[in-house]
Amino acid sequence: MHWGVGLVSSRSCVVDLSRNQTLSLCWCWGSEENYSFYGDIVAFPLQDYGGVMSGLGSDSWWKKTLYLTGGALLAAAAYLLHELLAIRKEQEVNSKDAIILHQFSRPNNGVPSLSPFCLKIETYLRMADLPYQNYFDGKLSPQGKMPWIEYNHTRVSGTEFIIDFLEEKLGVNLNKHLNPHQRAVSRAVTKMVEEHFYWTLAYCQWVENLDETQKMLNITGPLSDLLKWILCHLTKGIVKREMYGQGIGRFSEEEIYRLMEKDMRSLAGLLGDKKYLMGPKFSTLDATVFGHIANALWGTQGTYKEEGIAGELINLAMYCERIRRKFWPEWHDDNDNTTYESDDSGEDSRTHTPFQDFSYYSRTGTFEDDGMDNSISQTPDTDFTGHSLFDSDVDMDEFTDHDQCK
């Protein structure tokens, strides 16, 4: 009796590793990433192998070798699927009066997330000063989305709906200072970033620079390199198909980067010399734009986008640096002077400090009492006293963040 091994999922995903050990995948994927895969490994008998094998002869030494090799391949396929699809027992999460944020695991390049949407919503929670707990379980929401939250046993997915839910339940509002015109501009820019610029970023990460992205994935254990390769190439195929359906994927690489540059120049023009996109106070739009531009700046180092932001669009780079230092004090980039990098500094000189993660986060409770003096290092953007050139932007607001959120 010969058996095939495959994966059955309720989320429009079928992986077949039976007869020719090939991998086929069909997945419904949108602009908010669905990079995790779940399902059940099943085995099923193959009825038509008898005639084929009888034609090959019997009692041959290579026949036994074929059996052993086939069994080993099936066992390896089952193991790889188990590791790749992260099949595990569902953990019980107590979300009573607590925000549980489900997102992808931290990459190993020092950036909090390679997902612009995960970075967006986590930055929003920090801007709103809402304590939350991270869960890097890779589990998608019931709608197949990532990130998603649980609060008082209610599950909400989609960053826009998450923010609406938190505003309604907790009374926070980062946009209360915006007039109707500014709110309209904010929504239009949000859609440009999430529905247009996002796809150029995905192209850069998962198509054009796939090898570099593969190095950033935080996968450990046996066959980790093979698992990274499989996951990256699966994601590349998904991204290319989704980009083609969206329309951007029908253009050449040069045309895609031209569209990306237009979006970045539009953002740089909107920002101008302001502290935040809508003026002196941060808003939800800043969390959205930061999630995407920060990934382009620190998550794609050495690429066209990173060089364009750090070089010509200097105000966008300084804007991201301000937000990073204000709301991500534990995010240390050893190449902290990205914007002012010298010509002789190469990729080999870049190192990354592992992201210092906390199981529970509250900006006021975790960091304000600790003080930031110990975390200041001498870089080209600090003066001889050790104070950052960005301190005037960070510490001398005419209002408190707490008052803005209420």
From Swiss-Prot:
Residues 335-357, 369-389 are annotated as: Disordered. It is found in: Membrane. It holds the Pfam family FAXC_N. The chain crosses the membrane at residues 65-81. Its main location: membrane. CDD domains: GST_C_Metaxin, GST_N_Metaxin_like. It is a single-pass membrane protein. Coiled coil: none annotated. One of its GO terms (cellular component) is membrane. Keywords: Membrane, Transmembrane, Transmembrane helix. InterPro entries: FAX/IsoI-like, FAXC_N, Glutathione-S-Trfase_C_sf, Metaxin_GST, Mito_Protein_Transport_Metaxin, Thioredoxin-like_fold, Thioredoxin-like_sf. May play a role in axonal development. Belongs to the FAX family. This is Failed axon connections homolog. It comes from Xenopus tropicalis (Western clawed frog).
